[in-house]
Amino acid sequence: VWPEFAYGRNAVYDHGHHGNAILSRFPIVSWENLDVSSHILERRGLLHCEVDIPGFGRIHCLCVHLALDERGRSRQLHQIIERVVEVVPDGHPLILAGDFNDWRNRAGRRLAGELGLTEVFRDDRGRPARSFPAGFPIFRLDRIYVRGFSVYHAEVHHGH
């Protein structure tokens, strides 16, 4: 189903590991996983891929899972913004998605102001989607931010 994928391993345990993944129908031409951990007990990464979409061109896709504490998230947002400013050409199409653990809705204002990103569910429905816990979502922790193109439909996946 997904001929292209990138996986950035962020933490390794005796019983397995965890990280971020990007799945694509289109060729992933490059990828890099950056350590954005805010402290040693909570390993976090920023997975950055460049995807080549036939007839459209290249798009930068970033996947994150931010810290549980607000101070850590703030530092991680700073790292994400620095990465985008350094590597992604100004105004170039971009998707930034993942678990932002953004209980207070602070990331969106910062990402809009500094990178020109909009959140797809906020644009469509007026607020981010409920996505956690998966079985009965009540919290709005996951986000999809974009720039450089229009999103016509977005939904929370409820399958397994």
Protein language model features and the residues they cover:
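Structured beta-strand-rich core segments of catalytic domains in phosphoester-bond hydrolases
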Residues: 1-60, 150, 156-159
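Short aromatic-enriched loop/helix-cap "lid" or pocket-rim segments at secondary-structure transitions
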Residues: 17-20, 44, 74-75, 106-110
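A short secondary-structure junction signal
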Residues: 33-34, 62-63, 72-75, 108-109
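Acidic/histidine-rich helix-loop elements
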Residues: 38-41, 67, 133
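Metal-dependent phosphoester-hydrolase catalytic domains
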Residues: 50, 82-95, 100-160
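Structural recognition of the beta-strand scaffold that forms the well-ordered cores
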Residues: 60-63, 95-96
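Charged helix-capping and loop-helix junction motifs
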Residues: 76-81
